[in-house]
């Protein structure tokens, strides 16, 4: 009997007020008629870090190996995981221009959590009316707003 993996759709986004500045990330997970929203942030961060955190944190909540369609508006995340990561590792975490890769610890964390799942990466144009991308963006901005109001991230 074949082992069927749970199929999960994930929509992620990151936002930053100032770059660097207060940032937030949001994610929507959808499977078998269920849905879960996640969001949080960091006080001093960048938009790229928040884009990475959205994918990492969304994948970390999956309790078993899944077949994932992950949608992001971040070319940085999609190209990093799909095109650049293997070359960075072979070059001791250096870019083709010999600079140290930014956010190494997050790239390593993303690679680790990706190894548990079968993931298809999809790029969607940000701020172009895609409903689930807009919702993920709203969650990321909600994290920033809550931090500014309360002085902490609630999620």
UniProtKB/Swiss-Prot annotation:
InterPro entries per UniProt: RNase_H, RNaseH-like_sf, RNaseH_domain, RNaseH_sf, RNaseHI
Membrane-traversing stretches: none
Gene3D superfamilies hit by this protein: Ribonuclease H-like superfamily/Ribonuclease H
Lineage top rank: taxon: Bacteria
Subcellular location: Cytoplasm
Binding residues for Mg(2+) 1: 13, 51, 73
Oxidoreductase listed as a keyword: no
EC number per UniProt: 3.1.26.4
Domain (RNase H type-1) ranges: 4-145
Signal peptide feature range: none
GO cellular component: cytoplasm
Keyword Nuclease: yes
Keyword annotations: Cytoplasm, Endonuclease, Hydrolase, Magnesium, Metal-binding, Nuclease
Cofactor: Mg(2+)
Residues bound to Mg(2+) 2: 13, 137
Cofactor note: Binds 1 Mg(2+) ion per subunit. May bind a second metal ion at a regulatory site, or after substrate binding.
Reaction(s) catalysed (UniProt annotation): Endonucleolytic cleavage to 5'-phosphomonoester
NCBIfam families: PRK00203.1
Function: Endonuclease that specifically degrades the RNA of RNA-DNA hybrids.
Protein family: Belongs to the RNase H family.
Name listed for the protein in its UniProt record: Ribonuclease H
Species of the source: Bartonella quintana (strain Toulouse)
Name of the coding gene: rnhA
